[in-house]
Amino acid sequence: MGMLTEFKEFAMRGNVIDLAVGVVIGAAFGKIVTALVEKIIMPPLGMLIGKVDFSQLAWTLSPASIGADGKEIPAVVIGYGDFINTLIQFVIVAFAIFLVIKVINRLSRKQDAAPAAPAEEVVLLREIRDSLKK
């Protein structure tokens, strides 16, 4: 079997296609969550805390300065505001995934709980057995 044929069989398997669709949907969902956090959740939260733009929060370890040669030395800054935004995004995504898995588990338990109907042969054999008992 040629390498191209093997790759085609691999790529056309259901799991690979499902994974690709999941990655695309996940990327789109990530953009939605980013917009939700940055544009909807954080502005009111910042207003409640004191008109703070979380993405601009930072600790300046060393301010910008001009070196002896006249070149600007950039500031050394720890931008913890972006970290807070990213952390909130992670919590939202993790919670959404938790809810999806919870629903999937509930649906699979319902399918497992329903007993399978006996096969037609089994029903026929039971009828024969019952008629012989008479």
Curated annotation (Swiss-Prot):
Subcellular location: Cell inner membrane
Keyword entries, A-Z: Cell inner membrane, Cell membrane, Ion channel, Ion transport, Membrane, Transmembrane, Transmembrane helix, Transport
Cellular component GO terms held in the UniProt record: plasma membrane
Membrane topology: Multi-pass membrane protein
Principal subcellular localisation of the protein: membrane
Keyword Nuclease carried by entry: no
One Pfam family linked to the record: MscL
One MF annotation (Gene Ontology) recorded for this entry: mechanosensitive monoatomic ion channel activity
Record-annotated membrane-spanning stretches: 16-36, 84-104
Superkingdom assignment: Bacteria
NCBIfam families associated with the record: mscL, PRK00567.1-4, PRK13952.1
Family named by the database record: Belongs to the MscL family.
HAMAP family reported in the protein's UniProt record: MscL
PANTHER family according to UniProt: LARGE-CONDUCTANCE MECHANOSENSITIVE CHANNEL, MECHANOSENSITIVE CHANNEL MSCL
Quaternary structure, from the entry: Homopentamer.
Function: Channel that opens in response to stretch forces in the membrane lipid bilayer. May participate in the regulation of osmotic pressure changes within the cell.
Protein's name according to its UniProt entry: Large-conductance mechanosensitive channel
